[in-house]
Structure formats: C-alpha cells, structure tokens
C-alpha cells in the first residue's frame, strides 16, 4: 500500500476525494490533479455500473444519511471496504467518490459537509486497517517444531559436541 500512503493523512484523503469527484472539472483535474485522483476517476468511470448495483443493494442509504443516521452507512459501506492491496484501496476510494457524486444530487446538505463526512470515514477506515495490520504483525504465533525438526536439532547438537573445535568435545557429559 506504499502508493496509497497518502490515505493516512486526513487532508490528503479530503483532497483526493475532492479532486476525484464530479464537482471538479476534468480540465482542472487534467492540469493540476494528482495522478491518484486521475486513477480514481478512471476506476469510477470504468466500474460505474457495478457501483450502481452496490448502491441499490444498500437500500435507503441516502435517506438515512440525509436524516443524519450513520449506522447503515457504517454497516453496509465502511465495514466492507478493503485496503489489502493498492488496487482495492483505489477501488474503495473510487466507490466513496461515486457515493459523494450520487449523494450530492439527492441532498440538501452542503458539498463541504459531504466531503468532510466521507473523507473522515475513509480516513478512519484506513487508520483502523493499518492498526489491525500492526497488531497482527506484532503477535507471533507459537511455533511447535515437527518431529523432523527436533531430530535435526538433536543431530546438529551431537555434531557440535563432537566437533574438534568444541572445547568440551570428548568430555564425560555427566560432569
């Protein structure tokens, strides 16, 4: 996810969502937009129909968001975002950018609120994913050696004890 480390900074996430939404002109994006914003727009255009189907499965998502309820959004959208690979992270950003575009057509809320709301949830999901990875990498599973590994370790110890370079070689092991 090195290419998407910008997602760990809230202002960068907000800028990325803003640049990749339909509220930014393609000309501005072409001249001054980041390469990630251009990629997100491309993904959003390529997968428009799949994103439409996903939104249809969410039911009354925009109605609940317009009323200020976040539970459905958290359950159906945020918890299903995947950041395991750079491609999936880009698709997650594209989906939220698509949601911003659709939501802005159907709401009385300001564009700044929509942008802040989606950027905050995306940023929190990325941070949660990163913390989960750090936690998993710090936990080491107990390694139980197999019988072959135990036998190999015993042979290695015997060879080391019998080595002429070992100062204790040839001594009685009971001492």
From Swiss-Prot:
At the top level of its lineage, which domain of life is listed?
Viruses
**InterPro entries associated with the record:** Adenovir_t-Ag_E1B_19kDa, Bcl2-like
Q: Where in the cell is it found?
A: Host cell membrane; Host nucleus envelope; Host nucleus lamina
**Annotated GO biological process:** symbiont-mediated suppression of host apoptosis
One Pfam family, please name it.
Adeno_E1B_19K
Sorted alphabetically, the keyword list is:
Apoptosis, Early protein, Host cell membrane, Host membrane, Host nucleus, Host-virus interaction, Inhibition of host apoptosis by viral BCL2-like protein, Membrane, Modulation of host cell apoptosis by virus
Q: Which GO terms describe its cellular component?
A: host cell endoplasmic reticulum; host cell nuclear envelope; host cell nuclear lamina; host cell plasma membrane; membrane
- Region named Disordered: 147-175
- Chief location bin: host cell
User: According to the UniProt record, which cysteines are disulfide-bonded?
Assistant: none
Function, please? Putative adenovirus Bcl-2 homolog that inhibits apoptosis induced by TNF or FAS pathways, as well as p53-mediated apoptosis. Without E1B 19K function, virus production is compromised because of premature death of host cell. Interacts with Bax protein in cell lysates.
Q: Which family does it belong to?
A: Belongs to the adenoviridae E1B 19 kDa protein family.
Protein's name in the database = E1B protein, small T-antigen
Organism lineage: Viruses, Varidnaviria, Bamfordvirae, Preplasmiviricota, Tectiliviricetes
């Amino acid at each position: 996810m090195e290419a998407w480390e910008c997602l760990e900074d809230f202002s960068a996430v907000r800028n990325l969502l803003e640049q990749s939404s339909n509220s930014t002109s393609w000309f501005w994006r072409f001249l001054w937009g980041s390469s990630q914003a251009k990629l997100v727009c491309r993904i959003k255009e390529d997968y428009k129909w799949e994103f439409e189907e996903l939104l249809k499965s969410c039911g009354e998502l925009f109605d609940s968001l317009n009323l200020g309820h976040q539970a459905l959004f958290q359950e159906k959208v945020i918890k299903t975002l995947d950041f395991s690979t750079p491609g999936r992270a880009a698709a997650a950003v594209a989906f939220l950018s698509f949601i911003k575009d659709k939501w802005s057509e159907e709401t009385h809320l300001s564009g700044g609120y929509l942008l802040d709301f989606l950027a905050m949830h995306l940023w929190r999901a990325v941070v949660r994913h990163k913390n989960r990875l750090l936690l998993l990498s710090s936990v080491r599973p107990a390694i139980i050696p197999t019988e072959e590994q135990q036998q190999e370790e015993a042979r290695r110890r015997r060879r080391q004890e019998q080595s002429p370079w070992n100062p204790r070689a040839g001594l009685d092991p009971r001492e």
